[in-house]
Amino acid sequence: MRTIRNAIKRRHRLIVHLLLLVPVIATTFRGSTGHAESFQQNNSAEEHAQALLETLTPEERVGQLFLVTFEGKDVNFETQIYDLITNHHIGGVILEQNSDNFVVPPQTANGTWQLIQELQTTEWSASQSNQIEPETNEEFRPAFIPLFVGISQDGNGPPADQIFNNLTLLPSFMGIGATFETDLARQVGTVAGSELSALGINLLLGPSLDVLETPIEEGTGDLGVRTFGGDPFWVGEMGRAYVSGVHEGSEGGMAVIAKHFPGHGSSDRLPEKEVATVRKSLEQLKQIELAPFYAVTGNAPSELATVDGLLTSHIRYQGFQGNIRETTRPVSMDPQALDQLINLPPFADWIEAGGIMISENLGSEAFRRFEDPSGLNFQARFIARDAFLAGNDLLFVGDEFISTSDEDQYSSIVSTLDLFAQKYRDDPAFQERVDESVLKILTLKYKLNNSTIFTLGSTIPPQENLVDVGNSDQVSRQVSQEAVTLISPSFTDLAETIPVPPDINDKIVFITDERSAQQCFTCPEQQVFPKSGLMDAVLRLYGPLAGGQVVQRNLFTYSFDQLLALLNRAPEFDYTVLESELDQAQWIIFSLANVSSDNPSSQALSRFLAERPDLFRQKNLVVFGFDAPYYLDATEISKLSAYYGIYSKIPQFVDTAARVLFGEIPATRGDLPVSVSGINYDLISATSPDPDQTIELFMDVPEAILGTPDPTQMPELTIGDLIPVRTGVIFDHNGRPVPDGTIVDFVLSAGLTEIATQKETTQDGIARTTFLIEESGTIVINARSDPALESNSLQIDIPPEGIPTIEFVITQFPTETATQEPEPTGVISQTETPPPPPSAGSINLIDWFVAAGVSIIVGAVIYWLTTTFGLIRWGVRSGLLAIIGGLLAYMYIALQLPGSQQLLDVPGAWGVLLITTLGAAIGWGASYGWQRIAESS
């Protein structure tokens, strides 16, 4: 009997030791769950990609490197695109309006979905039968690898949008940028991601993260509204938000490719027109052009805000290495320049994590003209090879990717693929480079597919999703109202120049730079910016059926072409009617699109202002800029009654212009996102600190320490401690928080002597620093951020050692800026006891599973150990009571019964595990007591 009792005691000691180990083991697994899931997801995609890569033939591997365009909407077995997909295993396609890939509205969205379905089905069908491997003449079964289906859809309708029917027409990037509201950028991105992915598109060439540092007023070649603006910080912020929105809207099913890396904002040529040369060094690029790309790669705050790829631009740099006489090749083709760029720390980390580099169109008119100025010797396959070896993973080959000796694009693509396949077999270094890129491509495709295997069903979205496409106009309307900007005059002067809006008796002449486009080659011409657009909006919103502020007989509309005919005295146009109506009008309203030397009629407004002042003298002359806001010079702007920036020509923005004209919407919400020399507006100066503000200073003490949100209180400090100080939000000239990185000087003074100055930079408009208390006495802390030189003063009395109480006084300078004033004084005595911080203990569904698992494990261990001594009945009782005890303990804290919160707070993160284990131990103890009582009776 004694032997049995000793064995039972040993069993009990063993059980106690195991119980102590359970929470430690369980906590280890629990604490790593979130990170492990994310890591396993990325790891799983790469593992599946590696496994698939090892099964591919050389032809299948090199085919994945190419994104091609194709003409038309057919994918039958007689078409070239069918052959490229089936027999040459290309990685993807790019859809373009210029390639006639879309159908006539209103079937555009449905036709696009159908086209993409046929493309992906063709890829799948090719994997259902054997093919002959050309090198070995052996049969093999091609793998089904979903195609990238890409598009460039930059907003504002054509030409920036490839699809401009059936989808929601979204604002231009500059229209979004003028709001300075990242949430709106995110909403626009969400709509774009949702609607494009519903069509089956899984690769977006955008957004543009170019910084329009110095706009070109003549409109000869800059990006205009195709960029968020001219401040690198704000371009990065809006880009991050837009990218996050696209990823959210597509539910992770769309790759976002930022362009035009490393930045096209300083160029004086459009990327599709000519290869531009910019005089900038790498150090200069780091400060301006590269900053937005940093923001969405290595410096992105989340996976949602991180782009999947960068589109490398055909842009050259003079003085890239500091030698002004040295000019790079186009960056997309220059291995040294591109390698230097992508090895900068933010990009290197992003590349290591799977970021993909995509070349700009290797068949573009601009690139062909650069590589082959004579037009006699364009070697497409060697161009593609050089672009790949320069560091691009995917090669975009457009419809003009045609060697001089080849008949068409198809022939050049096939010969290029043959070259790559042969070089893959012959050159181990090239083979390694191909495998590296293909692995990244396959990994991205697995992530987009969100599946461990590629299936046709997971590749093509359901057709019923199309019912939700094109129904998000409210987002564009909201952006239009938040973006509208009064460029000239000031708000004060506007009340004098235009004291009242038009009334029912006023004659109004609307003159519009109308634009048209075709969705496809056989589609009818569409007026995407019609000459009657603004007049129609005015009639709809303020005409006889909407309040009767205007009547149609007093409204007249003309185009810029007609105005140009008047200025040229063209005999084929009866310009006398327009001339007479202008002469009799009280209001002349211009709707200005982009100005370009390629389009003479776009310059009609400038000519009108210079040549016919007699027709607008003593009239209300208003210009709405539906594109970039900098096309008019100072002299031209001085002749206007009002000049507004609208930034987009889509209908929602036209409606907003009408509402502004009639005073329904104030043009006070948006701000110019680029510099405008015509009104002497410099964006960098405008986003610098407002000199009329008084910077607020606070003791930067965490709320949890004080137990109060009042930032002007501080705990006891003594000599040798650090004084934590922060500013309030520092505002720029437009009343918005200054960009991150704005320099703030914190100045520590004693009397009239400056003891120390510390330079810090802002984050979310706020700067922080600390000062070391080295001696007793009275010190004063101020802050300045040029040109804002005034702040309140923190006066702190440091007592001698041994007297811990510190009193400080905040001196507030008078200011007209509307700021929240801190409390004037604050004293923390030694006897004050701060209230306890709020508890961080909480439980959730994961805790329930952990508690149940721990209870079952403990019960099973106790059962096993008890039965090893032959006590099967007591083993069952002990195990069950341990499980019951653990679950009862969990239920006690889950129901928040008295004392449960304190039980969670004391152990911290291990609370649930320890309490559950303790409950199980109590249950086992109860069974042990029961057993002892039973044995003694």
Specify the residue positions occupied by each region the protein language model found:
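Active-site-adjacent structural elements in enzyme catalytic domains
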Residues: 103-157, 177-200, 204, 233, ...
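Second-shell residues forming the walls of enzyme active-site clefts
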Residues: 57, 77, 108-118, 123-124, ...
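Hydrophobic faces of well-ordered beta-strands that scaffold small-molecule active sites
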Residues: 63-70, 91-95, 147-155, 203-207, ...
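Sec-dependent N-terminal signal peptides of Gram-positive bacterial secreted proteins and lipoproteins
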Residues: 13-32
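Short acidic, glycine-rich surface-loop motifs adjacent to enzyme active sites
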Residues: 84-111, 205, 296-331, 401, ...
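N-terminal hydrophobic targeting/anchoring segments and the immediately downstream early-domain regions
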Residues: 34-165, 169, 486-489, 575, ...
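Preference for extracellular/luminal or secreted protein segments
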Residues: 37-82, 86, 352, 371-744, ...
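Surface-exposed loop and adjacent secondary-structure segments within mature catalytic domains
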Residues: 139-288, 294, 298-305, 312-318, ...
